[in-house]
UniProtKB/Swiss-Prot annotation:
Keywords: Hypusine, Initiation factor, Protein biosynthesis. Residues 1-21 are annotated as: Disordered. It comes from Solanum lycopersicum. InterPro entries: IF5A-like, IF5A-like_N, NA-bd_OB-fold, Rib_uL2_dom2, Trans_elong_IF5A_hypusine_site, Transl_elong_IF5A_C, Translation_prot_SH3-like_sf. Residues 1-12 have a biased composition (Basic and acidic residues). This is Eukaryotic translation initiation factor 5A-3. The keyword Protein biosynthesis applies. It comes from the Eukaryota. It holds the Pfam family eIF-5a. GO terms for molecular function: ribosome binding; RNA binding; translation elongation factor activity; translation initiation factor activity. Coiled coil: none annotated.
Length: 159
């Protein structure tokens, strides 16, 4: 035993992996995949037949779930791909700060203050207008691979 103090930093994911492996041939449309290090939703999958010297290949066309950018990848169908753990959580909107951060109410009564307003113009104006009108708003937050972003809005009526 030493007399030194050991610092322990608590992490929310407790060391859990941000992705899990899945065989390329089993990933379907509307599933998720990691392409170029980004979590994506698959919008199109096509497979090519086995060639003279190789495997059948899967061609994935996917949209980055946070930026909306289109990405493509070609992987042998027998190989494993990384699939992100994607979670959706609903929070009640409490406040919008001057600097573009939102204050959200979690299920256990705590506040979550580390999220920015979304960059999508339509969603942004819906949130700002609804909040200005004093409506009770619930935002849906998508999280994957250590990133979080507001991606939907629900109006639960006037306060």
């Amino acid at each position: 035993m030493s007399d030194e103090e050991h610092q322990f930093e608590s992490k929310a994911d407790a060391g859990a992996s941000k992705t899990y492996p899945q065989q390329a041939g089993t990933i379907r449309k509307n599933g998720y995949i990691v392409i170029k290090g980004r979590p994506c939703k698959v919008v199109e999958v096509s497979t090519s037949k086995t060639g003279k010297h190789g495997h059948a290949k899967c061609h994935f066309v996917a949209i980055d779930i946070f930026t909306g950018k289109k990405l493509e990848d070609i992987v042998p169908s027998s190989h494993n791909c990384d699939v992100p753990h994607v979670n959706r959580t609903d929070y009640q909107l409490i406040d919008i700060s001057e600097d573009g951060f939102v204050s959200l109410l979690t299920d256990n009564g705590n506040t979550k203050d580390d999220l920015r307003l979304p960059t999508d113009e339509n969603l942004l104006s819906l949130i700002k207008d609804g909040f200005a009108e004093g409506k009770d708003l619930v935002v849906s937050v998508m999280s994957a691979m250590g990133e979080e972003q507001i991606n939907a809005l629900k109006d639960i009526g006037p306060k």
